[in-house]
């Protein structure tokens, strides 16, 4: 990135739903999980902007002064609650920077923006998960000062397992 480029962060608007989905698919491709993306523009719009919206998306834009800013990164956050702390926290669901723009401070700006959101809302922390093979991301997070939460595993009920535990009537 040269000196003329500036990073700015802005919240997604309803007009950005297709772009948010594009970033989600880019992350899924990188994580070798493209087959798992079933999100649509319609359900994403509802999650981000509907009556019961439960997520927020933000873009990192790069502007060089010679045209419209270009979205080069995206982060999606949700609220999480901890009974142990008795507080909500900010959960980083996704963060993705386009490959050609990595290593230039864009991911750091997105996480710093999230940290600012957490602080402004009175949340004591921001948390997220990372695939265990994603060493570049792990190194990046640890360089920022994030700590691995030892002793915890993530579990998920979905599909048939979700149906078996609570059969539809």
Give residue ranges: language-model regions.
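Conserved active-site alpha-helix within GNAT-family acetyltransferase domains
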Residues: 108, 112, 120, 132-151, ...
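A short beta-loop-alpha structural element at the N-terminal edge
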Residues: 8-20
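Conserved donor-binding loop and adjoining core beta-sheet/short helix segment
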Residues: 77-88, 93
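A short helix-loop-beta-strand connector motif used in the catalytic cores of GNAT acetyltransferases and
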Residues: 46-59, 91
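Conserved beta-strand in the GNAT
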Residues: 59, 68-78
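A short, internal acetyl-CoA/4′-phosphopantetheine-binding micro-motif in the GNAT/acyltransferase core
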Residues: 95-102
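Conserved GNAT acetyl-CoA-binding A-motif
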Residues: 119-129
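Conserved GNAT-fold acetyl-CoA-binding loop/helix
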Residues: 21-47
